[in-house]
Each structure stands twice: as C-alpha cells, then as structure tokens.
Amino acid sequence: MLRFKELYQQKIIENLQKEFSYKNKHEIPQIKKIVINMGVGEAIADSKVINNAVNDLTCISGQKPVVTLARKSIATFKLRESMKIGCKVTLRKDRMYDFLERLVIVALPRVKEFRGFSDKSFDGKGNFTFGLKEQIVFPEINYDKIDTIRGMDITIVTSAKTDKESKFLLSGFNLPFYN
C-alpha cells in the first residue's frame, strides 16, 4: 500500500477529527482528485509540440493525458476552433497518492528558490491550485530528451468545505505553506 494513503488513513484522519470535531466520519475531508494541466501555446505554429507535451505528462503522471482543444477561434492568437492547445490528466485513487508523494518528496525540493505555497492559492471551496514553471523537477523527465521547458498547473480537489480544513489536510501530507 502507498505511504501517503496509509498516512492519511492512520494519522491525518485522526488529526482532522481532533481539530474540527466532525460528527460523522464522512464529513472528514479527503483528496478527491489531482488534475495536471499543461497548456501548449506553441502548438498553434507547430503541431509536433503537442506530442512532446503528451509524452512528458505521460511520464510524470503514469497515465495517458487527454489532448485539450480550443473551444472558439481567436484571430489575434491565430487560433482556430478545435485546434490542439494543451493536454491534461486527472489522477484518482492510488495514482493520485503516488503522484502527491513524488511531488512532495522529490519534485518540490528540486524547485529553485521555493519557499512554500501561499494561502491565496485556495479557491474558497477547499480546492488548491498552483503552477510549476519546469517539468524537469520530476525525476521521470530526462533533461537531454526534452525539446523545451514547459510549465504545468496542478489542482488538488478536496472534499473540504473551507480553505482552513483543506490547508490542514494538505499540511498533513507535508505540503509546505509560508503564511
């Protein structure tokens, strides 16, 4: 079994219960899913770029991503409807905990000048979103084989009702916050 899943079941649930005194065990917040999105604006000019982004995201997540398409045409960006402009992957259950573990233990310590996350990254409903500027912080990415450095947005969706509950939950997984 995964370490972060065991950590949640054995320690974090107990700490959340003590802190917020829930009446029902189903009220205790948990992580529902993690969504990783990689927008590839260069794909407008060169369609091969999207394949490289898909390969990178597949290596990082361990799951094949879905290619996202433009919803409408925008002339100033030379964008047409249904053009490939990015890719995203939704992780649930064991893959979600596996990714979170690799993110906290391996990837975040490799980010340059990283002090922690801001409280402002919460959306008011308990979900947490942040961005990484480089995909090379993940050990699965071979630096010599990438064509360009790409960033990504990572959203952690929780069942928490408030940002305070969500922050307490994510702090239990050792996600660093500086506020």
From Swiss-Prot:
Give the protein's recorded name: Large ribosomal subunit protein uL5
The record ties this protein, via SUPFAM superfamilies, to:
RL5-like
Q: Is RNA-binding included in the keywords of this UniProt record?
A: yes
NCBIfam families xrefs: PRK00010.1 (NF000585)
Keywords of this entry = Ribonucleoprotein, Ribosomal protein, RNA-binding, rRNA-binding, tRNA-binding
List, alphabetically, the InterPro entries matched.
Answer: Ribosomal_uL5, Ribosomal_uL5_bac-type, Ribosomal_uL5_C, Ribosomal_uL5_CS, Ribosomal_uL5_dom_sf, Ribosomal_uL5_N
Q: What does this protein do?
A: This is one of the proteins that bind and probably mediate the attachment of the 5S RNA into the large ribosomal subunit, where it forms part of the central protuberance. In the 70S ribosome it contacts protein S13 of the 30S subunit (bridge B1b), connecting the 2 subunits; this bridge is implicated in subunit movement. Contacts the P site tRNA; the 5S rRNA and some of its associated proteins might help stabilize positioning of ribosome-bound tRNAs.
